[in-house]
Amino acid sequence: MVQPISWPQKVLVCSGGVDVSQLLHRIMPKLLYDNPKARQEVEYHWRASGCPHIVHVLDVYENIHHGKRCLLIVMECMEGGELFSRIQERGDQAFTEREASEIMRDIGTAIQYLHSMNIAHRDVKPENLLYTSKDKDTVLKLTDFGFAKETTVNALQTPCYTPYYVAPEVLGPEKYDKSCDMWSLGVITYILLCGFPPFYSNTGQAISPGMKRRIRMGQYGFPNPEWADVSEEAKQLIRHLLKTDPTERMTVSQFMNHPWINRSMSVPPTPLHTARVLQEDKDHWDEVKEEMTSALATMRVDYDQVKIKDLKTSNNRLLNKRRKKQKQAGASSAAPGCNNQ
């Protein structure tokens, strides 16, 4: 039978009688070893479950797994997959700037809900953005509260982050708070509009000293042809989100009131390069995701003082790889046919 136990949230003891095989078809479980950090994750996620763009926690069970006390978080099943995967699978169907705007409005709704509760998510990235189903009218939701923290008078100082989406103040001694989530929104917006991140590691590592320096300097650009047709309004929004000084970065309220977000139907339905870029670099993106997962547990703040490269001499490994492939493809198509002798 299932019995309630004493806890601030709805935690249940699972002692038998539950048909797990049937349950797994309808829910998405997550197992955590029972400790204060795990209970904090459950608490924040449970409190945020009222938002339509945050994955709902249905129940939490306490049990013994391999001799250790555990918490089983039962969440709604997100059958639509990850944000990037859905865009990759579009094939020849164009992904438009208007769609990118609508996606960012939904993500912003989740962040606004959290920030109104004084909760910083601190790990907003595409892998944590899931669709409820594969249907056309599916809903995008934010998940994974493993690094979430309540913001108080003391700003957040714990250096836990994912490299491609980490705010510059996390890489140095400065304190950081909700503005970290806003920085992540800027990076996700950037990727949605072109298919590659604004910051990168030239060494192939998940994060390198050079990548850290570029993040701290706000060193990025809008290269053609991927950005040639993207609206200036979208670029302006990204500039406000990627401000290196967190005090100058826009808040979530300002983000939601920005015309590119709150008037998404007026955003031009311009076809973007995003789906093609993500599809062409699909294998590389899988590698990047693996690097980011391992980096979460291993990265530490590094105060490398090596001279910063100028933007003109900085090499974007991801972009250069794509340019090389494009040149090779162009050379092949331009080569004359062979005549039989």
Question: What are the residue ranges of the model-derived segments?
Answer:
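Short beta-strand micro-motifs within the conserved protein kinase catalytic domain, predominantly
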Residues: 56-69
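Regulatory extensions flanking the kinase catalytic core
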Residues: 248-288
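Catalytic-loop of the protein kinase fold
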Residues: 115-132
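Conserved short submotifs of the Hanks-type protein kinase catalytic core
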Residues: 68-82
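Activation segment signature within eukaryotic-like protein kinase domains
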Residues: 103-104
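Conserved catalytic-loop aspartate of Hanks-type protein kinases
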Residues: 181
